A protein has these predicted regions:
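ABC ATPase NBD coupling module
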Residues: 68-82
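The feature captures the beta-strand-to-loop junction immediately N-terminal to the Walker
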Residues: 36-38
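Conserved catalytic motifs of ABC-family nucleotide-binding domains
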Residues: 154
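Catalytic Walker B motif of ABC-type/P-loop ATPase nucleotide-binding domains
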Residues: 158-161
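Conserved ABC ATPase "signature" region
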Residues: 111-129
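Helix-to-loop junction immediately C-terminal to a conserved catalytic motif
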Residues: 51
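Conserved ABC ATPase signature
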Residues: 133-137, 141
């Protein structure tokens, strides 16, 4: 079930530098929201806070779902949220095992795990590489693997931090197609950062401009 996330006056400081300054915004469930802004405006910091990997210095986050109201910020909620970084980390093992990692630690049964990973490898265009060592993938293929690893656990909130930066056009187009297909299902709330204005317009009408640690336009 997709999540709605409301940010209430979020502030964050690093080494006496104010990164986020009283930021408030609501990301509605099932939408694809694109965060834009210059380097250092706080986009990546905001995603880490949304992923519950960091705490704000001030303000609070409210997660909710239709028919369930506000949700407690516990381990159960954390497992419904995934963050994909600009450069995905892969481990020494097959592409299949890399994608299956999140299902394994959640104790998903073998048959279900095999089925879900198989579908995700097809979705990400990595079906013919399932037995290949993930360390041998190109940067673009590794990025697709990372998104597949995030999606296979069926998250309710997917956070994508510059998912197509520094990869070739072919893999960028494949990842954009994946995001558009996810968007059509409405089953996952997506928040993504990008510097590419054209890409932002291709992926969503919900464009959010950050400046000086705040939302300046949406």
């Amino acid at each position: 079930m997709p999540l709605t996330l409301t940010l209430n006056k979020i502030s964050k400081t690093y080494d006496d530098e104010l990164i986020l300054s009283g930021l408030s915004y609501t990301f509605n469930e099932g939408g694809t929201h694109i965060l834009m802004g210059s380097n250092g405006c706080g986009k990546s910091t905001l995603l880490r806070i949304c992923a519950l990997l960091e705490q704000p210095d001030a303000g609070n986050l409210v997660f909710s779902a239709s028919g369930k109201g506000e949700l407690p910020q516990d381990l159960s909620l954390r497992r419904r949220i995934t963050l994909v970084l600009p450069k995905v980390g892969v481990f020494n093992g097959t592409v299949f095992n890399n994608v299956a990692y999140g299902l394994k630690i959640r104790g998903i049964a073998k048959d279900e795990k095999t089925e879900r990973v198989g579908k995700m490898l097809k979705f990400t265009g990595l079906e013919n590489k399932r037995t290949q060592n993930a360390l041998t993938l190109s940067s673009g293929e590794a990025q697709r693997l990372g998104i597949g690893r995030a999606l296979v656990i069926e998250p309710d909130l997917l956070l994508l931090d510059e998912p197509t930066v520094s990869i070739d056009n072919k893999n960028r187009e494949l990842i954009e197609t994946m995001i558009l297909q996810m968007k059509e299902t409405g089953r996952t709330t997506i928040i993504m950062t990008t510097h590419d204005n054209s890409q932002a317009e291709r992926l969503s009408k919900k464009l959010i401009l950050m400046k000086n640690g705040r939302i300046s336009l949406s």
